[in-house]
């Protein structure tokens, strides 16, 4: 789920438009209903978190009418699960559940991403998805400098993120409003 850019752009867009973009960007490689629903729900979570919502409020913001794979996860089916009950197989529902579970069961960016990576299986996917939410919840300033220093194209990524969030002529204050 390569959704952070969509959610960053989405802080200034109507949530319905942002979710359409989230679904469409998924269609380029993953067009199954579960993939589209996961992208919609996660984009809404990320958008809310970027705008300042805490974890529970961001999750609540993603509530909606989803199918049998994604609906239970957004409703909280992962709550109370132990680590050995969380799969990181690469299937979209497993990846979404694992990412949400990792952030819910930690209190900082490092621990969330490391927990995701240490689940094994499709660890890079799970950690990347987790990192998007952990970064949105805990803030970019909480990411280890040593990790950021190794990031390829870091300067370009940061510039593009600023452009997505604050396009020319649209600078100003933003805050979570429950949408």
What are the residue ranges of the model-derived segments?
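Conserved catalytic/binding loops enriched for acidic/polar residues
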Residues: 124
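Short, small-residue alpha-helix embedded
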Residues: 127-138
């Amino acid at each position: 789920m390569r959704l952070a850019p969509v959610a960053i752009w989405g802080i200034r867009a109507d949530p319905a438009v942002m979710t359409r973009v989230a679904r469409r960007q998924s269609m380029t490689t993953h067009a199954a209903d579960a993939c589209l629903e996961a992208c919609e729900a996660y984009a809404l979570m990320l958008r809310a978190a970027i705008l300042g919502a805490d974890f529970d409020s961001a999750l609540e913001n993603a509530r909606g009418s989803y199918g049998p794979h994604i609906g239970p996860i957004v409703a909280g089916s992962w709550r109370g699960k132990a680590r050995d009950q969380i799969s990181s197989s690469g299937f979209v529902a497993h990846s979404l559940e694992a990412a949400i579970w990792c952030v819910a069961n930690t209190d900082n960016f490092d621990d969330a991403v490391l927990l995701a990576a240490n689940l094994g299986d499709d660890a890079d996917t799970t950690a990347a998805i987790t990192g998007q939410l952990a970064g949105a919840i805990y803030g970019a300033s909480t990411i280890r400098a040593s990790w950021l220093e190794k990031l390829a194209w870091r300067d370009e990524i940061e510039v593009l993120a600023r452009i997505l969030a604050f396009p020319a002529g649209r600078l100003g204050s933003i805050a979570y409003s429950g949408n």
